Regions:
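Non-catalytic, C-terminal membrane-associated alpha-helical segments of glycosyltransferases
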Residues: 215-222, 230-286
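Short, flexible, basic/aromatic active-site loop/helix in glycosyltransferases
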Residues: 130-149
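Conserved donor NDP-sugar-binding/catalytic core segment of glycosyltransferases
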Residues: 96-127
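Glycine-rich, basic loop-to-helix element that forms the pyrophosphate-binding segment
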Residues: 61-81
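A conserved acidic beta->alpha catalytic loop
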Residues: 24, 38-47, 63, 93
Length: 286
């Protein structure tokens, strides 16, 4: 019998975490079905999921479709199969036993998306979570659900009705920026995102090396996020864009933002069109 909750996990070479990730869903106090969408893993992820979690719905992509496109496959499945809630769970993350139940109980009051308190594997608040949400948690220290302007998509509980309104992830983003853009569109449609204090979950991403060039490329994605925000002035963002990237280049002593500007110049028509498409209800999934 199908439950009300579908947990979607997008995988790519996920063997390091899969037992804890999927096992935590199996141990949840709220029954949740699992869907794994694999982006061409080469470490045995597919075989492990089929063997250890035979009840999970498994989808094998023909190529690495990226985080957003792979999640859209799961979102469409959830909508067509009558689920009430979707939980987007990173492959390097896991939930506490009562996490999903606490979040479902906290929905309401205009929230279209909720996150638990996100910790690292050592039990400390995840650094990015604290940086993005910490001051709002401190400001509303008596509130069980704290409104925040943004929270990372490692752990999202989303009612399927939210996807009918906001849509899925934009195809413009293949790696990073998808969650920023989705929340911009969530706000555009008058919905809120929040953090549930009584729900806890882990995002295990400490101690992963990353080159300066890669870090700078990821910083540059923030420019695409701003251009894609349906609530912002597109022309104004285009005018600011060169100065923003130049400042980023000077501050970080890197040529990556300048090279990124050349790439981005050819993308402007596509970004403008996709931004308009993103305003429609159910964008990118219907």
């Amino acid at each position: 019998m199908m439950g009300e909750v579908l947990v979607i996990v997008v995988t790519w070479n996920a063997m390091t975490w899969l037992e804890r990730c999927l096992g935590s869903v199996r141990g949840s106090s709220v029954k949740a079905d699992i869907m794994v969408v694999d982006n061409c893993s080469t470490d045995g992820t597919q075989e492990y999921v089929r063997r250890a979690f035979p009840d999970a719905v498994f989808v094998q992509n023909d190529s690495n479709a990226g985080f957003g496109a792979a999640n859209n496959i799961g979102i469409k499945y959830a909508l067509s199969h009558g689920y009430r809630y979707v939980y987007l769970l990173n492959q390097d993350a896991w939930v506490d036993k009562d996490c999903i139940g606490s979040m479902i109980a906290s929905l309401g009051d205009g929230y279209g998306l909720l996150s638990p308190m996100q910790t690292d594997a050592r039990g400390n608040l995840d650094r990015n979570f604290e940086r993005k949400c910490g001051k709002f948690l401190a400001r509303h220290n008596d509130s069980p659900v704290v409104p925040v302007p943004f929270v990372m998509a490692a752990h999202w509980l989303v009612p399927t009705q939210t996807f009918r309104i906001v849509g899925g992830f934009s195809p413009v983003f293949t790696q990073y920026g998808e969650d920023d853009n989705f929340i911009d569109r969530l706000h555009y449609h008058g919905l809120k995102c929040g953090v549930v204090r009584t729900a806890t979950a882990v995002h295990d991403r400490l101690d992963r090396p990353s080159s300066k060039e890669r870090r700078m490329r990821l910083k540059c994605v923030s420019v695409i996020v701003k251009l894609s925000n349906p609530s912002a002035c597109f022309t104004g963002q285009c005018l600011i864009l060169p100065f923003r990237l130049l400042g980023m280049s000077v501050k970080n002593r890197s040529l990556v933002p300048l090279r990124f500007f050349r790439e981005l110049s050819g993308m402007i028509p596509v970004l403008k069109r996709t931004r308009e498409e993103s305003k429609a209800s159910g964008a990118f999934i219907f």
